């Protein structure tokens, strides 16, 4: 039997199930299947090189999730050690990457300058991509969510009547459920997306992983392909909203921080009110949606678009 990377991963995963919590086991496979398998799933693990592992880690870190990239590096290192122990490979190709990401751990991800918003929307409308992915990038700009939170979103998390999205605790960076108010434009985009993917569980279902969702690299690759590599990242949309626009408009700083799910552990360990500052959050999310839509409409005019839809 050929010892492909995927085969060794599944063997390693099975042998370690007894040592992990259930949610941890699922998270490991989900990350590896979405970020690593598409590139080297069928590659014999003996042919895996440092550059192959580094390329995957770099692509994950480029989304602004350096800690996730480091976790993936650690898992790959463990998998390669496991393969070495079983004498499937002679040495661990992940070993030289120990400490590789430390130098970028505090680096700020590139943020799209607000002066470029109209141009960004113009390129997005012209991009050769699937309609649901175009809508996904537009939603990411509107809801202040982290990339992985939107990529893995399920329709059951949305209360469209109440115009709310409740992200469950297990999908948040910190284990606390997070509530997102949905502006009018956000609702319109979700209505378009519902027609495309509403028949399944996920807003952005995977074409390759049955019952799964798209790779967290998807939106970043589209943005890079639009010519914004090194200029803008999907994670940077959060900074664009909070630092570049909303704070300058005088919106409540605490409300903005809460909407970004920036909560200090020492302040809210005993009780966490996910609806705190809710009226403020609803107001500035609606205002910001209008601000972005203004740039979007300018882009449509420049492109000669005649439809109101993102598709």
Show which residues each predicted segment covers.
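Catalytic-site neighborhood detector that most strongly recognizes the C-terminal catalytic loop/helix
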Residues: 103, 111, 166-175, 187, ...
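Hydrophobic (often cysteine-bearing) scaffold residues that line and stabilize catalytic clefts
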Residues: 5, 9, 21-24, 28, ...
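Active-site/catalytic core of tyrosine-dependent DNA strand-transfer enzymes
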Residues: 113-118, 162, 181-230, 240-241, ...
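Basic/aromatic-enriched alpha-helical hairpins
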Residues: 1-63, 79-82
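Basic, Lys/Arg- and aromatic-enriched nucleic-acid-binding interface segment
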Residues: 60-75, 85, 89-152, 161, ...
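Short hydrophobic short-linear motifs embedded
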Residues: 301-309
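C-terminal catalytic core of tyrosine-transesterase DNA break-rejoin enzymes
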Residues: 85, 138, 142-149, 218, ...
